[in-house]
Regions:
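A short, basic N-terminal segment
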Residues: 1-51, 268, 272
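C-terminal alpha-helical "lid" subdomain
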Residues: 2-11, 70, 187, 204-275
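Mid-core helix/loop region of P-loop NTP-binding domains shared across ATPases and GTPases
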Residues: 11-13, 92-95, 107-151, 159-164, ...
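Conserved NTP-binding/hydrolysis module of P-loop NTPases
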Residues: 18-23, 81-83, 91-110
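Walker A/P-loop nucleotide-binding motif
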Residues: 51-71
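Short hydrophobic/aromatic beta-strand immediately N-terminal to the Walker A/P-loop
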Residues: 55-58, 85, 137
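Short regulatory helix/loop adjacent to the ATP-binding pocket of P-loop NTPases
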Residues: 73-76, 176-191
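Conserved AAA+ ATPase "SRH/arginine-finger" region at the nucleotide-binding site
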Residues: 86-89, 180, 193-206
Length: 275
């Protein structure tokens, strides 16, 4: 199956005159569509960073959380902000600290207390010597163990100083909220000042999304009939990753039929290949 994918991709791209893969999930920053959701997330994150607090971003798998994070963080001036991005796992607090130490380009040193001191020292140096603000972004935060949430607030506490040194952005699935509601998570949860949730997009937004992705490939007209857009929206439930697969598959089906327009039947055919 893998061997057949590239010729199939080249065939539909050639048929529709596309300059690149359609509905590519790995878009460059300049090609990301700034939706109302993303604008709202940006505003909430700006507020979180100003306060040096904790912000949340939740959403189901494929809803576009990581893309939204990349876009929002790209708007932070690189000479002013040092962004530390960690993709969380279900490991211990020590493993989390090791990930953080690695991103800070520090040596993997000692026990937990030594690591905490080293992390805080590194953050202080960035803030005081480089005159930069540090923001910690934890993607897939819903994978984190409860005992890690119970201790995570310690790296935001700097003795004899109320200055907000380390704002944190936590991104994950909706069960992230459940984990933060545990009593042991309260020291961290009490620092949350902003919360965003990536909702599935509606039918109108889906049409804008499809047109945007077609334009990225160099196609200036809407190849999708109205009922095809509705079929993509209904079939994906408004989840962007599913919509990408469906829409691309429908383009392949249309090209195979030598049809310059994508119909609902092409979308349904694509759905049988994907789901």
């Amino acid at each position: 199956m893998e061997k057949g994918r590239e010729p199939m991709s080249a065939t539909y791209r050639s048929f529709f005159g596309m300059t690149r893969e359609a509905f590519d999930p790995d878009l460059g920053l300049k090609d990301i569509l700034e939706t109302q959701d993303i604008t709202s997330i940006r505003q909430r994150f700006d507020y979180t960073l100003r306060l040096g607090a904790v912000g949340l971003l939740t959403g189901e798998v494929g809803s576009g959380k990581s893309t939204a994070l990349r876009f929002v963080l790209s708007k932070l001036h690189p000479s002013e902000y040092k962004t530390i991005w960690i993709t969380a796992c279900s490991g211990s607090i020590l493993e989390f600290y090791r990930l953080l130490i690695s991103e800070l380009n520090m040596g993997n040193t000692g026990c937990k207390s030594v690591m905490i001191k080293s992390i805080k020292k590194s953050i202080r140096q960035i803030v005081l010597e480089k005159k930069m603000k540090v923001v910690l972004v934890v993607d897939e935060a819903s994978l984190i163990r409860l005992e890690v949430f119970a201790e995570l607030h310690t790296i935001t506490q700097f003795e004899q100083d109320s200055k907000p040194w380390l704002p944190i952005i936590l991104a994950g699935r909706s069960n992230l909220i459940d984990k933060l509601m545990y009593q042991t998570s309260m020291p961290l949860a009490s620092r949350i000042v902003a919360r965003s949730h990536m909702e599935p997009i509606n039918r109108q937004e889906m049409e804008q999304y499809i047109l945007h992705h077609l334009a990225i490939t160099g196609v200036k007209t809407n190849l999708f009939e109205d009922n095809a857009i509705t079929a993509v929206h209904q079939g994906s439930g408004g989840i962007l990753r599913k919509a990408n697969h469906l829409a691309r598959g429908a383009l392949v089906a249309a090209a195979k039929d030598q049809s310059m327009t994508v119909t609902a039947d092409h979308v349904r055919l694509a759905s049988t290949e994907i789901f």
